[in-house]
C-alpha cells in the first residue's frame, strides 16, 4: 500500500524531551521521552511521543508516531473558521480567529502545533496546566472540533447564507 506522506514534505518540531527513570534492583534505568509535532504547513498536523534510551532514537519514534496521527485543519483564508475552547487533563486551550496580518499569538506548545498546521493568523490562550503533552493534546482536540460554515449549514439543514 502506497502512502502519500512520502511525497509531501513534513516539517517536524521537538516540543519536549524528558529524562525518565525507572528504579530497579541494581539502580536507576535512564530513558528519554520525546514529544514531537509534525505538519505540512498546509492544513495537516499531527503529534507523537517516543521513548528510548537515546534522545535521537526517541525523537525518531515520536516522528513516526506523529505521521500516523495526522489530522486535517479546516481554514478560512489564513485563520480558523471560529473560536474553540478545549481541555485535556488539567490543560485548557482557547483558540480564536484573528484578522489577516496579525500573526500567531500563541506560546510554546500551542505555537508549534498552530505554525506546523499552517495557520498564519490566530490568537490563543493557554489556561490551567502548562504540561506540554496536555497542551498539545488540547490544541489538537480543538483543531479537530473546527467546522467550516458549509459543514455547519449542512448539519443544520439550512443554506450557508441563512447561517449568519
Swiss-Prot record:
GO biological process: translation
One GO location term (cellular component): small ribosomal subunit
Coiled-coil intervals: none
Keyword Mitochondrion appears in the UniProt entry: no
Cross-referenced InterPro entries: Ribosomal_Su5_D2-typ_SF, Ribosomal_uS5, Ribosomal_uS5_bac-type, Ribosomal_uS5_C, Ribosomal_uS5_N, Ribosomal_uS5_N_CS, Ribsml_uS5_D2-typ_fold_subgr
Residue ranges constituting the S5 DRBM domain according to the UniProt record: 10-73
Presence of the UniProt keyword GTP-binding in the record: no
PROSITE patterns associated with the record: RIBOSOMAL_S5, S5_DSRBD
Swiss-Prot/TrEMBL keywords: Ribonucleoprotein, Ribosomal protein, RNA-binding, rRNA-binding
GO molecular function, one term: structural constituent of ribosome
Gene3D superfamilies found in the cross-reference section: 3.30.160.20, 3.30.230.10
SUPFAM superfamilies: dsRNA-binding domain-like (SSF54768), Ribosomal protein S5 domain 2-like (SSF54211)
One protein family per Pfam: Ribosomal_S5
Family classification: Belongs to the universal ribosomal protein uS5 family.
Protein purpose: With S4 and S12 plays an important role in translational accuracy. Located at the back of the 30S subunit body where it stabilizes the conformation of the head with respect to the body.
The record's note on its domains: The N-terminal domain interacts with the head of the 30S subunit; the C-terminal domain interacts with the body and contacts protein S4. The interaction surface between S4 and S5 is involved in control of translational fidelity.
Quaternary structure and partners: Part of the 30S ribosomal subunit. Contacts proteins S4 and S8.
Protein name stated in the entry: Small ribosomal subunit protein uS5
Organism, as annotated: Streptococcus pyogenes serotype M1
Amino acid at each position: 500500500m502506497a502512502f502519500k506522506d512520502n511525497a509531501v514534505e513534513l516539517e517536524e518540531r521537538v516540543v519536549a524531551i524528558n529524562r525518565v527513570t525507572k528504579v530497579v534492583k541494581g539502580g536507576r534505568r535512564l530513558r528519554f521521552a520525546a514529544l514531537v509535532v509534525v505538519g505540512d504547513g498546509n492544513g495537516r498536523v499531527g503529534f507523537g511521543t517516543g521513548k528510548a534510551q537515546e534522545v535521537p532514537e526517541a525523537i525518531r519514534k515520536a516522528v513516526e508516531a506523529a505521521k500516523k496521527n495526522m489530522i486535517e485543519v479546516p481554514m478560512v483564508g489564513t485563520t480558523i473558521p471560529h473560536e474553540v475552547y478545549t481541555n485535556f487533563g488539567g490543560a485548557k486551550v482557547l483558540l480564536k480567529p484573528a484578522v489577516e496580518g496579525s500573526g500567531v499569538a500563541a506560546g510554546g506548545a500551542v505555537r508549534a502545533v498552530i505554525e506546523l498546521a499552517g495557520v498564519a493568523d490566530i490568537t490563543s490562550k493557554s489556561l490551567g496546566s502548562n504540561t506540554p503533552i496536555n497542551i498539545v493534546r488540547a490544541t489538537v482536540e480543538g483543531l479537530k472540533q473546527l467546522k467550516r460554515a458549509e459543514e455547519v449549514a449542512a448539519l443544520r439543514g439550512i443554506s450557508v447564507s441563512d447561517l449568519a
